[in-house]
Curated annotation (Swiss-Prot):
Keyword terms of this UniProt record: Aminoacyl-tRNA synthetase, ATP-binding, Cytoplasm, Ligase, Metal-binding, Nucleotide-binding, Protein biosynthesis, RNA-binding, tRNA-binding, Zinc
Gene: thrS
Pfam families linked: HGTP_anticodon (PF03129), tRNA-synt_2b (PF00587), tRNA_SAD (PF07973)
Necessary cofactors: Zn(2+)
Protein source organism: Ureaplasma parvum serovar 3 (strain ATCC 700970)
Protein name as catalogued: Threonine--tRNA ligase
């Protein structure tokens, strides 16, 4: 096990800066904070002909370790604005920080003859830092603004003993092996191409199979819970999003509008405004509620290029999105119904909720949230009471609500201990009013329905990233793009029979492929293992002689099993049906 000590890592950042200053005396140090896992330091070499490579990290790290043995102390000194400016007069980044904090207390920390502008805190002396590792080099911008100077960033970690560092590095290697970007590339699931555009994913055939299988399953779940599927436009008029409030509260995430003829259109970032139009398409009665709608919609949301991360953060996404329009007295039933639907979907996908958050608004943030205190109090109390009445454990998270209402977030803990929101239930009293949605109540008068937003699995892109990380790419049979690979021992003698067997399997909707490449048998079997194909069948003279039998082996096993073709097909069909 390992534990990150913020004070220790902050001190290690100073050691990094000291080592850098020795090797690159003309550099300008920027900032060196701690982060969740370690530290980094940003700097400018001030020399276009000089660069830092991964090999340079070794000598820098060696110098840092040398400094730890010197038992240098970290000595605090409070300084005036004028003295701080004098000390750092040749460093524009430090001067920028000083100027920004001229009305606050300023301090520096000394270690021997070296010093840095810093608030602290630090360890007593450098000997407390027993284990250091510099991890990688990246680029950054001063103040995170692409209009400012481009800087170099070096990441590192520090621990109080070598065992913790070893454990962390082992964990880091495991993360790399589970990185959905690597697995997605190895299994040919998806790709990106700058010619298409940054953050715009291209689903390859194998990935599309997984997506379609998940969608088929989710469609079945939605059908069981009486949802009707709709299809709405990928574009929406700017007036649609002004009416919904997204333009005011979500504008930074909406792609720039385009004018076509006499309309101003935007790529839709949300489906909910479109679903209000489905509801308003006809007169509704209290007897016809609830109305339950679902859609697997393509959305576009702007993310900065620095925020794009594989399939986890993209600019185009496919969202599974459900909306319920109901009476006030139906809220509890519909929310519990949504709970059951989410639980069934997560169980089928092998996902387990770690904890539930009740995401509330921040009443002090008038810019982020719609300003209607009564609406917020009513909607939040409804969800809070429902969770308590049904003894559902939850945490309240202020400032995490949608701009239009509170939500229940289902948090999943991944094998790498990351907490990710997969499913949501959101209560909305705002949009029905903004779109003038009504129904005829029992008194033959108009009433406004309540809108409930439900995300069963979120986006398909993020879901696939989670599944790949959780399974290391070893997907269950029903999700595997290729379920069976058939390999002939001799391409010249066994090809006809192999093709016949492939046709037979495909008639039963089993996703089988034939490997007819002119390669060694051992190589084909090894590559089938690398591709994580659940079943491999090898066909030779003996199998053809007894043409009612097949010999197979499972992924990750050396054991072979011989069964009848009929039994093999029945076994696969049963596993697929049971989502195994």
């Amino acid at each position: 096990m390992y534990k990150f000590d913020q004070k220790l890592n902050h001190s290690a950042a100073h050691l990094l800066a000291m080592a850098l200053t020795k090797f690159y005396p003309n550099l300008s140090l920027a900032i060196g904070p701690t982060i969740d896992e370690g530290f980094y330091y940003d700097f400018n070499l001030n020399d276009p002909n000089t660069s830092i490579t991964p090999l340079d990290l070794l000598k820098i790290e060696k110098e840092m370790k040398k400094i730890t043995t010197q038992a240098l102390t970290f000595d605090y000194e409070q300084v005036t604005y004028e003295k701080a400016k004098e000390l750092f007069k040749h460093n524009k980044y430090k001067l920028d920080i000083i100027e920004q904090n001229k009305n606050n207390s300023l301090s520096i920390y000394h270690s021997g003859k070296w010093f840095d502008l810093c608030k602290g805190p630090h360890v007593q002396n450098t000997k407390e830092i027993k284990a250091i590792k510099l991890l990688n080099i990246a680029g950054s911008y001063w103040r995170g603004d692409a209009n400012n100077d481009q800087l170099i960033r070096i990441y590192g970690v520090a621990f109080s003993d070598q065992d913790q560092l070893d454990a962390y590095l082992k964990d880091l290697q495991e993360r790399k092996e589970r990185d959905h970007r690597k697995i997605g590339k190895d299994l040919n699931l998806f790709t990106f191409n700058n010619l298409a555009g940054q953050g715009l994913p291209i689903w390859l055939p194998n990935g599309t199979i997984i997506k379609n299988q998940v969608q088929k399953f989710i469609n079945e779940v939605e059908f069981q819970f009486n949802f009707d599927t709709v299809i709405t436009p990928i574009l929406g008029s700017i007036d649609l999003y002004k009416t919904s409030g997204h333009w005011d509260h979500y504008k930074d995430n909406i792609f720039s509008p385009v004018q076509i003829d006499n309309e101003i259109l935007v790529l839709r970032p949300m489906t909910c405004p479109h679903h209000t139009l489905v509801y308003s398409n006809e007169l509704r009665s209290y007897r016809s509620l609830p109305i339950r709608l679902s859609e697997h919609s393509i959305l576009h949301r702007y993310e900065s290029s620095g925020g794009l991360t594989g399939f986890e953060r993209v600019r185009e996404m496919i969202l599974e999105d459900c909306h319920v329009f109901c009476r006030f007295d139906q809220i509890e039933h519909e929310v519990i119904n949504a709970f059951k639907m989410i639980q069934e979907a997560q169980e089928g996908l092998g996902i387990k909720t770690f904890e539930i958050h009740l995401s509330l608004n921040d009443p002090n943030d008038k810019e982020k949230y719609y300003d209607d205190p009564q609406m917020w109090e009513q909607s939040q109390n409804v969800l809070r009471k429902m969770l308590k009445d049904h003894n559902i454990p939850y945490k309240e998270m202020v400032g995490e609500a949608a701009f239009y209402g509170p939500k229940i977030d289902f948090q999943v803990k991944t094998v790498l201990n990351r907490i990710i929101t997969v499913s949501t239930i959101q209560l909305d009293f705002l949009l029905p009013n903004r779109f003038n949605l009504t129904y005829i109540n029992e008194s033959n008068e108009q009433s406004v329905p309540v809108m409930i937003h439900i995300g069963i699995i979120g986006t398909y892109e993020r879901l696939l990233a989670i599944l790949l990380e959780q399974t290391k790419g070893i997907l269950p049979l029903w999700l595997s793009p290729i379920q069976v690979v058939i390999i002939p021992v001799n391409e010249n003698l066994h090809t006809d029979y192999v093709k016949e067997l492939n046709i037979k399997l495909r008639k039963h909707l089993i996703r089988s492929n034939v490997d007819l490449r002119n390669e060694r048998l051992s190589k084909k079997i090894r590559e089938a293992q690398i591709q994580k194909i659940p079943y491999q069948i090898v066909i030779g003279d003996e199998e053809i002689k007894n043409n009612k039998m097949v010999t197979y082996r499972c992924y990750g096993s050396e054991k072979t099993t011989t069964v009848s073709i009929t039994d093999f097909i029945n076994m696969l069909e049963n596993k697929i049906r049971l989502k195994k």
